[in-house]
From Swiss-Prot:
The keyword Disulfide bond applies. One of its GO terms (molecular function) is ion channel inhibitor activity. Keywords: Acetylcholine receptor inhibiting toxin, Disulfide bond, Ion channel impairing toxin, Nematocyst, Neurotoxin, Postsynaptic neurotoxin, Proton-gated sodium channel impairing toxin, Secreted, Toxin. Toxin with different activities on acid-sensing ion channels (ASIC) and nicotinic acetylcholine receptors. Is able to bind T.californica muscle-type nicotinic acetylcholine receptors (nAChR) (alpha-1-beta-1-delta-epsilon (CHRNA1-CHRNB1-CHRND-CHRNE)), and human alpha-7/CHRNA7 nicotinic acetylcholine receptors. Weakly and reversibly inhibits rat homomeric ASIC1 (isoform ASIC1a) (IC(50)=1.25 uM), while it potentiates rat homomeric ASIC3 (EC(50)=1.53 uM). Rat ASIC1a current inhibition is not complete, and reaches a maximum of 86% inhibition. The keyword Secreted applies. It comes from Radianthus crispa. It is found in: Secreted; Nematocyst. Belongs to the sea anemone type 3 (BDS) potassium channel toxin family. This is Pi-stichotoxin-Hcr5d. SUPFAM superfamilies: Defensin-like.
């Protein structure tokens, strides 16, 4: 995925998803236009 910024963390941008996929250990997310940024901090 594309890197993205979320509260100062670098995350992964998931296109067309409204919530982060499970099983990756994500515990922080930021909503973006047409997708979501998911961060494992």
């Amino acid at each position: 995925g594309t890197p993205c910024d979320c509260y100062g963390y670098t995350g992964v941008y998931w296109f067309m998803l409204s919530r982060c996929p499970s099983g990756y250990g994500y515990n922080l997310s930021c909503h973006y236009f047409m997708g979501i940024c998911c961060v494992k901090r």
